[in-house]
Amino acid sequence: MKPAHFYYKLGIVLLLLFVVVSASARPKGDPTTIKQQMEWLHKTKKINFTYDASLPVGQVYRGPSLKHLPLDKALSTLFAGSGIDYRVKGKYVILSKAQRSAPPLPPKPASASTARHTLNGFVRDTDGETLINATIWDETTGVGTTTNAYGFYSLTLPEGDHLIKYSYIGYEDKKLKEPLHGNLRQDVTLSESKSLPEVVVVGDLNSPLLNTQTGKRSIGPSDLKTGYALLSSPDVVKTLQQVSGVAEGVELVSGLYVHGGNSDENLFLLDGTPLYQINHTLGLFSSFNVDVVKNVDFYKSGFPARYGGRLSSVVDVRTTDGDMHRVHGSVRFGLLDGGIQLEGPLQKGKTSFNIALRRSWLDLLTRPIFAIVNKNAGADEDKVNVSYFFHDFNAKITHLFSQRSRLALSTYWGQDRLNTKDEDDGGGMGYRDLSKSRFNWGNFNTSLDWTYIVSPKFFANISGVYTYSLSKLWSKEDFSSGEVGDGSLSNYSEHDNQSTINDIGYRASFDYRPTPHHHLRFGHDFTFHHYRPQGSNHIYIDKNGGRSDTLQSHTASRLTATEWNAYAEDEIRLNHRWSLNGGINVALFHIQGKTFASADPRAAIKFQVSPRLSLKASYTTMTQFVHKISNAYIDLPSDYWVPTTRRLHPMHSHQWAAGIYMQPDKHWLLSLEGYYKCSSHLLQYTNWIGLQPPADSWDTKVNEGKGRFFGLEFDAHYAAHRLQLDASYTLSWNKRKFDDYYPHWFYDKFDNRHKANASVRYHFGKGTSLYAEWIYHSGNRLTLPTQYVNFPDLGEGGSQDFLYDVPNNVSAPAYHRLDIGVDLHHRTKNGHERIWNWSIYNAYCHLNTMWVDVKYDSDHGTMRAKSKGYIPIIPSFSYTFKF
């Protein structure tokens, strides 16, 4: 078997070969005369030229390529300074001799003496909602910018008339002629496109083709609501699971394992506030309600300096502000959950609100079932009751003090509750046994966010944030028998365990755009952390006849820490081909009298080979001061978070990434990326059997180790009038080493060598669309015994046991499934919209491996393993009404 490094080196060679072939496949050169350019425009743009033979169309053309310019821009570029005038009439371009005038001067390079002014403002949709990552492009000078996380843009241009194009994916472009003779405030409203989207990213500065970062993916509401939805409920995390380089972990769970990292190595931000518990129903649903999600920026490499605190990924989720002009909303009913969303003005044009509530109703379905079962239970049968539900509540109030000043109050409250009860009346045997339990876990986040336009070039944001995370387990056992007196017996026990995190702090961030070629971001934040990993109370009362014994215990672990971060980054456009994003993130983490310091440099560079081909590379370092202690690979209420202590080092990673991004035509977008990441001071809890590892002196019960993760990722996207295709493939290796656990490198549990996704969506018209997605990846790894040993007789018959060698030494069978669904949209005469969704999970009912049963075959002296799968085909339905 060839080593993994051979395949990785082979992949790098193929990547470089792809670059060379792609570059060589481009046209060798454009036509060299104006006439040849006219012939090319005639063929490609389907236009005809009418002109006198005496016109100098044979002169050499020395201007830029016309290939990717719109017709009006191509014509003005072609005939500029040629002595030829033109006018367009339908499909004809009529040429004439230009009137004598002073020859046009060549463009002057920008200098301090050139008058420059700043165009700035907000880009919004027709509901008044700001648009993140919208593109603002000056077709006159060929420079542009994008809106920030608050929809604000700033573009400094030479004095004079400019043609500005405003664009956003899924919206109609808007062009405005701006006479710039001083600083100009221009707020722009874009209308949602009525036509189906096509991949036209040449002008989208946030597209993978044109942005500087590697490993960035931006997801809007349309991406979330048009992709596959498990149980017909769109989900942020499950959408991200389909991205190349991301493993989902356990089936049906909203796990996120990025470039070999653990689930606690992802930074989840909700309106800039960290979120610790990101799942409901043990991971079946994520905590993000897509009814209020405006934009998701996902980074798996090339992290900008403004982010820090986690090793593997950043998920930056922004929510909608609310309509400033009219009240509207939606109601959704799904198989297991539903929700309502409402937004509108509190004061027209000044203050808006946006609220959304989502709740599961599994408890409403199971409650009558258990009532009927318990009513019909026999005298000797237990009466059982199980109740579970979750809810999310999002609320946001936004107020505009002026065109320059805005204040927003955001709140999120998410909670899961699981109650169980088991009662045995003894069936006439003279005893009673009652057991109860309550599990409660969730988040409460709130932030007060103030933004202010200091000047047309300078944007400021100041926020106060508070985060509360809770996991609480309570259980009771009550057993009694006999009559009260000397012959009676009773046992009573009660256990209460609670884990909490309280974070309070502030952050200040600033955007400064001195020129179109520089976008400076800098800021800092401070957070006070209060961790309570475990606080438990235990009461035990034993009554035997006339005696009574009571035992009571209390344990608590508390840690406080302060964290300070500062960052600075600059997005630099060196020229029309080279762009650079460089910066540094500095952090101080103080705990138990010790201060940890980190300085993480970040750098990303892009070379724009042509408007349709770019090359990128990046290097980032990340430091992480918090860890999640868990005994399973699903989110359980027994998991808890702890900070780095004076006994341990913060986790640290270095990551290199490089890739090629190309758009062969307006329908296709292709990318190929390679990455290599090495991590140090990773943690692994020593062997523990039970629901919750003890938090008392937890830092003495973990092993420190390191990781090595590398791979190649290919992505393809195609969109035409009715058809949309997406495909991705990942080839990766994930290895870890913990010397105190196993002295050599071993594969990670989610070392899925191959991962492939392919999806298709077809719009039939009249609001009907059909979609399907096929998912494949190599099986997760398992640790299986290699030997079965009989230990010698020590006086009581001896014993037998399994012996283990390398951790994660076996791969489970490959995982694959097909999901299909159909959407039906209907708009009523009064403008309301009805949406029906039918979907099928695991359409061909392939039972993928959930666990493996291991047995010793004594006849053959070998170990036998059999995989077990339990998740079958799952149909679902949802109905949404928008009003």
Regions found by a protein language model. Give the residues of each.
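Short, acidic, small-residue-rich periplasmic hinge/interaction motif at the N-terminus
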Residues: 38-45, 82, 88, 93-129, ...
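Periplasmic N-terminal accessory/gating domains of Gram-negative outer-membrane beta-barrel systems
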Residues: 143-146, 170-172, 184, 202, ...
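Transmembrane beta-barrel wall of Gram-negative outer-membrane proteins
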Residues: 336-360, 376-420, 438-460, 466
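C-terminal beta-signal and adjacent terminal beta-strands/loops
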Residues: 362-365, 767, 776-798, 815-883
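Face-selective signature of the C-terminal outer-membrane beta-barrel domain
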Residues: 398-416, 439-593, 608, 612, ...
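Surface-exposed extracellular loop regions of Gram-negative outer-membrane beta-barrel proteins
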Residues: 417-419, 424, 470, 537-538, ...
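Outer membrane beta-barrel strand-and-loop segments of large Gram-negative receptors
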Residues: 503-505, 555-559, 645, 649, ...
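Gram-negative outer-membrane beta-barrel transporters
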Residues: 676-678, 700-784
